[in-house]
Amino acid sequence: MFLIEKRRKLIQKKANYHSDPTTVFNHLCGSRPATLLLETAEVNKKNNLESIMIVDSAIRVSAVKNSVKITALSENGAEILSILKENPHKKIKFFEKNKSINLIFPSLDNNLDEDKKIFSLSVFDSFRFIMKSVNNTKRTSKAMFFGGLFSYDLISNFESLPNVKKKQKCPDFCFYLAETLLVVDHQKKTCLIQSSLFGRNVDEKNRIKKRTEEIEKKLEEKLTSIPKNKTTVPVQLTSNISDFQYSSTIKKLQKLIQKGEIFQVVPSRKFFLPCDNSLSAYQELKKSNPSPYMFFMQDEDFILFGASPESSLKYDEKNRQIELYPIAGTRPRGRKKDGTLDLDLDSRIELEMRTNHKELAEHLMLVDLARNDLARICEPGSRYVSDLVKVDKYSHVMHLVSKVVGQLKYGLDALHAYSSCMNMGTLTGAPKVRAMQLIAEYEGEGRGSYGGAIGYFTDLGNLDTCITIRSAYVESGVATIQAGAGVVFNSIPEDEVKESLNKAQAVINAIKKAHFTMGSS
C-alpha cells in the first residue's frame, strides 16, 4: 500500500501541569464525543503515574461483525481516507458515504488451524491499512496513537459461538486516531501537547497549529470543578437476574464441570443505575478505588468509565516482550462496622485467601491458561511466570495475581497477539472456547464492553490494554455495571453471588455518591 511520503508533521508544545486530569478533561473536552482519558497508578501506593488524553480525534474506527466503518472527524482525517480509497484490498468490499468508508471483510474460516487463522484477513487489518498509509519516518512515540475499546463480543468473529441478543450500541471495537494528544507525567510533573498532521493540506496545518496554541492557553486558565447535580430522589439498583437466578445458573454450570465439559467458567450479571453525570462518577471512583488502569471514554453512542485492576495484554516493541496479568481469587476487604479498615481482620482475610485450596487451584489453572495463550505466539523457550500468587488490594476487594511474560514471535505484531489471546481467561474460564460458548448460552445476551479490553496501540508497535472490569457502560442515561465470579467444581454458589456484587460495589457506590445525597438508596 502506498505511503503518504513525508507528509507526517508533528507539533509538540510543553504546557502547564495540572495534578487532576479529570478536571483537565472536563475543561478541554466537555461532553464532546471521540474523546478519551487513560490513566495509570501504582498498585500499592496508589500514586498517579501517567495520564494520556485524546482531546481531538482525526478518525473514528468501529466494527460490527465483519464490517468496519472509518469516519473522518476532520479534514486531517479525511486525508487518510483519501489514501485508503485509492488502494482498496481485492478481497474487501468497499463502500463510501459522506465522510465515511465501510470495509466489508470476508468471513473467517473457523476450521483453519491456529497458525493459519492468525494470518487470515480480518477486521484487525483495517488498523494495519491505516498505519501503512502514513509513513512515520522519524519513528516518533505516540505520533500515530489509537485509543479505544475492544469489546468482549469481538470474539464471535473468530470463534463459533451461539448467537446472542445485542441490547447495547457498543460496537465490536471502537478506536479514535488522536489528532491532538495530551501526555501528562505525574512523577515529573510535566505536560506535553502533541498534534499530528496526516496530510499536506496547508489550511489544516495552520488550523492544527492554532488549535495546539489554543489548548496551551486553556491550560493556563483556572480550571473549573466538575459540576455535581445531586438529587434526594431515592434510586433503586436493579439487576438483569436475581440472586436466586444467578445461583441457579452457577449450579447448572457446576453440573457441566462435574461431567468434564469445562474446568472453570465465569458467568456474569448486570446491575443498572441512573447516571447522567458520568465524569463526576468517574472522579468519585478514582478517589475511592485508584487502580493500575483508569479510563473515561466518551463516544457518540455511549460513555464508558472504570478503574480496572487487571492488565489485558501489554506489548513492548523494543524488546518484543508480551505480558498477561491473570487475576483470580477475590475477597472483600476487612472492615469495622463503621466502614473503616480493620488491619487485623484484613490480614486474616488475606491469609485465608492465600491458603485456600479452591482459590489457589482456580488461580493456578488460569495462570496455566495464560501460559498456553502465550505459547502459541511466543518464541520457544521465552515464556515464563515472572510473578506468582501475589496479592493486590483495592477499596472493596483484594485479589490473587500473577504475571506471565514471553517474547513475541517474529512476523507477528501486537494486534496478532491480542486476536490470538482474546478474551482473557479470567473473564471466560477454561477450556476457553467451550467456556465462552456456555457463557453465551446461559447469559443469552452480548457482554459489550465488559470483559473486553480498553487501552491504546501505536504504529511503532506498542500496545497497552486492561480488561474492562470494575466499569460502567452508560447509554441513554443508564449505567450498566457488569460483574462475574469464577466458578469451579467446589465453588459455593452463595459465595459467588456475593462476590459478583462485591466486584461491582466500588462503581455502584461512585455513581451513587456523584448523583445522590446521603440518605438516598
From Swiss-Prot:
Q: What does this protein do?
A: Part of a heterotetrameric complex that catalyzes the two-step biosynthesis of anthranilate, an intermediate in the biosynthesis of L-tryptophan. In the first step, the glutamine-binding beta subunit (TrpG) of anthranilate synthase (AS) provides the glutamine amidotransferase activity which generates ammonia as a substrate that, along with chorismate, is used in the second step, catalyzed by the large alpha subunit of AS (TrpE) to produce anthranilate. In the absence of TrpG, TrpE can synthesize anthranilate directly from chorismate and high concentrations of ammonia.
Q: Its quaternary structure?
A: Heterotetramer consisting of two non-identical subunits: a beta subunit (TrpG) and a large alpha subunit (TrpE).
Q: Which domain of life is it from?
A: Bacteria
Question: Which sites bind Mg(2+)?
Answer: 362, 499
Q: Please give the family membership noted in the entry.
A: Belongs to the anthranilate synthase component I family.
Q: In which pathway does it act?
A: Amino-acid biosynthesis; L-tryptophan biosynthesis; L-tryptophan from chorismate: step 1/5
Q: What GO terms describe the biological role, i.e. biological process, of this protein?
A: L-tryptophan biosynthetic process
The EC number(s) attached to this protein equal 4.1.3.27
Cofactor(s) needed: Mg(2+)
**How is activity regulated here?**
Feedback inhibited by tryptophan.
The cofactor binding remark recorded in the entry reads: Binds 1 Mg(2+) ion per subunit.
Catalytic activity of the protein = chorismate + L-glutamine = anthranilate + pyruvate + L-glutamate + H(+)
InterPro entries, A to Z: ADC_synthase, Anth_synth_I-like, Anth_synth_I_N, Anth_synth_I_TrpE, Chorismate_C
Taxonomic source organism: Buchnera aphidicola subsp. Acyrthosiphon pisum (strain APS)
Q: Which UniProt keywords apply?
A: Amino-acid biosynthesis, Aromatic amino acid biosynthesis, Lyase, Magnesium, Metal-binding, Plasmid, Tryptophan biosynthesis
**Which NCBIfam families does its entry note?**
PRK13564.1, trpE_proteo
Chain sites annotated for binding chorismate? 329-330, 450, 470, 484-486
Q: Which Gene3D superfamilies match?
A: Anthranilate synthase
In which residues is L-tryptophan bound? 40, 292-294
Query: GO MF terms on file?
Result: anthranilate synthase activity; metal ion binding
Name of the gene = trpE
Write down what this protein is called.
Anthranilate synthase component 1
